[in-house]
Amino acid sequence: MGQKIHPTGFRLAVSRNWASRWYANNNNFAAMLQEDIGVREYLKKKLKNASVGRVVIERPAKNARITIYSSRPGVVIGKKGEDIELLKSELQRRMGVPVHVNIEEIRKPETDAQLIADSITQQLERRIMFRRAMKRAMQNAMRLGAQGIKIMSAGRLNGIEIARTEWYREGRVPLHTLRADIDYATSEAKTTYGIIGVKVWVYKGDTLGRNDAPVVEEVAEEKRPRRNARPGGDRRPRRDGEGGGPAGARRGAPRRAGGAGDGGKTGE
């Protein structure tokens, strides 16, 4: 069922990391998760024109650190940093703890799955033909280094009466391979005919390391000595008389045939 599973969830802790990186007990987990969802929805509406790819939320020691990945960081920061300060104050009011906001630039927006999906949905809302928007996005992604891309649109495409699904693929998109770096995202276009859903898979090559996965420190196991090992090394060779047998006896040697009265001599 590799075609059905979420590509990011399938690779969590292997080559991908979580978007919310914090721990909570059973009493606070639901409230903190709902808070994260509200923050992401607010940032999606507030920074609609800033080309935001993803948002990472961390909560270290009664604080919050939010990292916004955008291809247009100047729009997020604003003139002389005014917009970022207003954004920070609003996030502090919503979360109730001090918030630190970091902005990271996306160098290649043409190969980012979320930005590709958002771009296609914006074109669909402007009544651009869906095939033209999909093929243009695929050409740009392949031109800038993507090894494969797949785009799927579903809904009342071009305003037809019966909804259908169409998808196009260029290159290869190995969804079963865990080491494959697959970027996956979805978006929705709200048209006059209804909602059109867009899904994007981008294959960026194989990851030799852990990529964005959480780092787990491996504890080196100490080499335990053997139970019967001697400090001097291997055991010395056994001499005659050791091991519980009589002196001169050898394991597996034939017994003498003579009795005690003949002086130990054999029959002559």
Curated annotation (Swiss-Prot):
Subunit architecture: Part of the 30S ribosomal subunit. Forms a tight complex with proteins S10 and S14.
Gene Ontology molecular function, alphabetical: mRNA binding; rRNA binding; structural constituent of ribosome
Biased composition, class Basic and acidic residues, residue ranges: 232-242
Record SMART domains: KH
Described purpose of this protein according to its UniProt entry: Binds the lower part of the 30S subunit head. Binds mRNA in the 70S ribosome, positioning it for translation.
InterPro entries xrefs: KH_dom, KH_dom-like_a/b, KH_dom_type_2, KH_sf_prok-type, Ribosomal_S3_C_sf, Ribosomal_uS3_bac-typ, Ribosomal_uS3_C, Ribosomal_uS3_CS
KW Ribosomal protein (keyword) present: yes
Keywords of the record: Ribonucleoprotein, Ribosomal protein, RNA-binding, rRNA-binding
Disordered: region residues: 216-268
GO CC annotation, single: cytosolic small ribosomal subunit
Ranges of Gly residues composition bias in the record: 258-268
Name of the protein in its database record: Small ribosomal subunit protein uS3
Record NCBIfam families: rpsC_bact
